[in-house]
Amino acid sequence: MRAGEALRRLGERRPLVHHITNYVSVGLVANATLCTGALPVMAHAREEVAEMSGAAGALVLNIGTLDERQVESMLAAGRAANERGIPVILDPVGAGATALRTRTAGRLLSELEVSAVCGNAGEIATLAGLAAEVRGVESIGGDAREAALKAASSLGLTVAATGAVDYVCGGGRALAVENGHPLLGRVVGSGCASTAVVGCFAAAAGSADPETVAHALAYFGCAGEEAARGAGGPGTFEARLLDALAALSSDPSRLSGRLRVGDAGAG
């Protein structure tokens, strides 16, 4: 689904997007969801997550601040989402940095029907079984396109490897998204927020196919470009990013001709 159509549908339906995410970026993630046009809920208690996912249009799982109880909540929510057939989006934050994170990402992928995975080049390379260097939650180098292609093929789902250029692969397609701004890399949680936007678009489309994911990332990157104009630094940029997400979602026609999504080749 293309950005304009997704944003119009979000404005009409206001679907609930259920996040089980990390406590570092939870506020930014919730606000990015709201500004995009969906309704965020940040429920993580094991006792209620299945019920909450049962009312949602999409589920977004983020392992940024990981513990065993949270993993059990993610599995319970994911099973409920799978029963209802709603999209499940995974952000494998820090996969490759520690054994726990790598193992947890693998467990979620093996026990749940995940619709799309969004991460940096190092995280995606780790899931694809490629050599990768991940320091903390940051990727150090790596070929994002190669990682996305390999992971999409081996996992059998949509994979987005984000960076200066985002590569979205799946179903024999490979797309490149060139929207964005370097200041996005100066704000902690911007990657989490971009995955949240993917969840919003997936809720609108009812799926997380490569085109839907690519246009979600292009919309987010376009908001980053707009926010950077006049921003004094990372602090003002973060506030302006939310303003830009809201402005573009309120008037999708402003995206016309601005989204840079192209074919990245499939081999």
From Swiss-Prot:
Family: Belongs to the Thz kinase family.
Protein's recorded name: Hydroxyethylthiazole kinase
Annotated EC: 2.7.1.50
Record pathway: Cofactor biosynthesis; thiamine diphosphate biosynthesis; 4-methyl-5-(2-phosphoethyl)-thiazole from 5-(2-hydroxyethyl)-4-methylthiazole: step 1/1
Gene Ontology biological process terms, A to Z: thiamine biosynthetic process; thiamine diphosphate biosynthetic process
Positions with a binding annotation for substrate: M42, G189
GO molecular function, a single term: hydroxyethylthiazole kinase activity
Pfam families: HK (PF02110)
